[in-house]
From Swiss-Prot:
Part of a complex composed of FtsB, FtsL and FtsQ. InterPro entries: Cell_div_FtsB (IPR023081), FtsL/DivIC (IPR007060). This is Cell division protein FtsB. GO terms for cellular component: cell division site; cell septum; plasma membrane. Keywords: Cell cycle, Cell division, Cell inner membrane, Cell membrane, Coiled coil, Membrane, Transmembrane, Transmembrane helix.
Length: 118
């Protein structure tokens, strides 16, 4: 009977030590949960980067194979035009104030640039 008590005491001590390691020791349950969240976030980041790499690879292939992509980039980013082409710039007119516009009542001329006082 006395041996059973010692065995029970040793098993209870072992169980409490294992529980302590599970909850508070290295590799505890909170740390495992945190690592699982980081794994999910890393998978999402990897997928986003895969899509970006695919997009960049398609753009590189397009630039290597087709002149249209190079021409489009030269026009939009560098403002270049082809020889013999005429470039027209469309400038929007400044809207004229309507009769019921409140700025016209205060003598504000929208066509003239505003001068700041010094």
């Amino acid at each position: 009977m006395r041996n059973w008590r010692w065995l029970l005491l040793v098993l209870a001590a072992l169980l409490s030590w294992l529980q302590h390691r599970f909850w508070f020791g290295p590799g505890n349950s909170g740390e495992v949960r945190m690592l699982q969240v980081q794994i999910v976030q890393q998978h999402q980041e990897n997928e986003r980067l895969r899509q970006r790499n695919a997009s960049l690879a398609a753009e590189v292939k397009n630039l290597k194979d087709g002149d249209a992509a190079i021409e489009e980039r030269a026009r939009s980013e560098l403002g270049m035009i082809k020889p013999g082409e005429i470039f027209y710039r469309v400038v929007e007119d400044i809207p004229t104030p309507l009769p019921n516009d409140t700025s016209a009542d205060h003598g504000v001329d929208l066509a003239q640039p505003r001068r700041e006082k010094r």
